């Protein structure tokens, strides 16, 4: 019981740290964001934070979820919500619109993300 409480508090702390971290900005020389039309509608997400999987907060969170950081390709989005509407139109995403391969962790984390333009 105590271990479960500690794990829950630790996970909450990691999420708080990850959300408080600065947003991801693509490094120079990276490719332009993919158009939203090239992403399946169900995979479009609006994430508060997008970071490399190897960043400290994200790597810690992935470890808690039992995901090997080396297995993650692309970026990781934190606290994401689905983008609704045709082609992302009228989505109201003021954060980081991304297209993610794995959204199976609810709104907590999305894996294998690439930036998209809406």
UniProtKB/Swiss-Prot annotation:
- Keywords linked to the UniProt accession: Cell wall, Disulfide bond, Glycoprotein, Secreted, Signal
Q: What cystine pairs are annotated?
A: 39-99, 46-93, 47-80, 100-113
Q: What induces it?
A: A CT-rich motif, which is often found immediately upstream of the transcription start point of highly expressed filamentous fungal genes, is present at the expected position.
| Any one Gene Ontology molecular-function term assigned to this protein's record | structural constituent of cell wall
Output a single Gene Ontology CC term carried by this record. Answer: extracellular region
Q: Where in the cell is it found?
A: Secreted; Secreted, Cell wall
Instruction: Write the signal peptide boundaries.
Output: 1-20
Task: Give the record's glycosylation annotations as residue positions.
Answer: 102
Q: Which domain of life is it from?
A: Eukaryota
Q: Which residues cross the membrane?
A: none
Entry's family note: Belongs to the fungal hydrophobin family.
Oligomeric state and interaction partners are given as: Self-assembles to form functional amyloid fibrils called rodlets. Self-assembly into fibrillar rodlets occurs spontaneously at hydrophobic:hydrophilic interfaces and the rodlets further associate laterally to form amphipathic monolayers.
**Function as written in the Swiss-Prot or TrEMBL entry:** Aerial growth, conidiation, and dispersal of filamentous fungi in the environment rely upon a capability of their secreting small amphipathic proteins called hydrophobins (HPBs) with low sequence identity. Class I can self-assemble into an outermost layer of rodlet bundles on aerial cell surfaces, conferring cellular hydrophobicity that supports fungal growth, development and dispersal; whereas Class II form highly ordered films at water-air interfaces through intermolecular interactions but contribute nothing to the rodlet structure.
Task: List the protein's name.
Answer: Class I hydrophobin 10
């Amino acid at each position: 019981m105590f271990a479960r409480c500690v794990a829950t508090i630790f996970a909450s702390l990691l999420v708080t740290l990850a959300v408080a971290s600065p947003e991801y900005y693509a490094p120079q020389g990276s490719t332009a964001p993919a158009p939203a039309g090239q992403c399946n509608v169900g995979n479009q997400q609006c994430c508060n934070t997008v970071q490399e999987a190897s960043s400290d907060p994200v790597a810690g969170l992935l470890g808690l979820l039992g995901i090997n950081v080396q297995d993650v390709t692309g970026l990781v989005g934190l606290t994401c919500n689905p983008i609704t509407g045709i082609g992302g139109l009228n989505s109201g995403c003021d954060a980081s619109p991304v297209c993610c391969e794995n959204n199976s962790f609810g709104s907590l984390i999305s894996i294998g993300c690439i930036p998209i333009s809406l």
